[in-house]
Amino acid sequence: MKLFIDTANIEEIREISKWGILSGVTTNPSLIAKEGRDLKAVIQEITELVDGPISAEVVGETYEEMLEEAKELVRIHPNVVIKVPMTEEGLKAVSKFSEQGIRTNVTLVFSAPQALIAARAGATFVSPFLGRLDDIGADGIGLIEDIAHIFHIHHIDTEIIGASIRHNLHVMNAAKAGAHIATIPYKVLKDMVKHPLTDIGIEKFMADWNKTKK
C-alpha cells in the first residue's frame, strides 16, 4: 500500500518527504483555508517536493464550474489530480475529465455503490472516508473491503485511497482491507514511527555504550 500525506502545510510535506516514503499528496479546501494561502501557489510548491499524484479539489458545485477550475489546476503540473466531490455534477465532470485524459480523485465516498459509480464514470481514485464513518458508528474498514472486492471481481483499475485517517490502526486496517493507498495526516505519520519499546531500547543501547567510555 502506498502512502500519501493529507495536508497543505508545506513544512509538514518538506519534513516527511525527506523520509523517502511519500508517493503523493492530498489537499482539500479546508486544509488550504487553514494555511491562508492561494490554492495554486500551494499546489505548485507541493509539486516541487513530491513526485507523485497531488490532489487539488475543485470548489464549484456545477459541472461547468468544475471544468473551469480544473483547467487552471492542471496547468500547474502534470502530477495534479483533480479532486471532485461525489455528486451528480461531479460525476459528469469526472466523465469529461476522463475523456480528456485528466486524472481524478472522487472524494466524500461513504458507500460501495458510490465507489462503483465513481469508478464507472472514469475516476482514477476513490476516497472512502474512514474516520467520518466511525463517527456515526459505521464500518469504514468494512467499506474498503467491499469496494476492493467489487473492483477485483470486475477488473476495475480505479485505486482506493483510505481517507479521513485518524490513527495508526486505520492505516494498518486499510492496508489489510485492500486499499491501494492511505492518505495520512502529518501527526499520524509521526506517530507511526514511534513505539515505547523502541525508545526503551535506544536508551538501553546508549546507556550500555556510555559505560564502555568510562
UniProtKB/Swiss-Prot annotation:
It is found in: Cytoplasm. One of its GO terms (cellular component) is cytoplasm. Keywords: Cytoplasm, Pentose shunt, Schiff base, Transferase. It catalyses: D-sedoheptulose 7-phosphate + D-glyceraldehyde 3-phosphate = D-erythrose 4-phosphate + beta-D-fructose 6-phosphate. One of its GO terms (molecular function) is transaldolase activity. Its EC number is 2.2.1.2. GO terms for biological process: carbohydrate metabolic process; pentose-phosphate shunt. It is an enzyme of class 2 (transferase). InterPro entries: Aldolase_TIM, TAL/FSA, Transaldolase_3B, Transaldolase_3B/F6P_aldolase, Transaldolase_AS, TSA/FSA_arc/bac. Belongs to the transaldolase family. Type 3B subfamily. PANTHER family: TRANSALDOLASE. Transaldolase is important for the balance of metabolites in the pentose-phosphate pathway. This is Probable transaldolase. It comes from Alkaliphilus oremlandii (strain OhILAs).
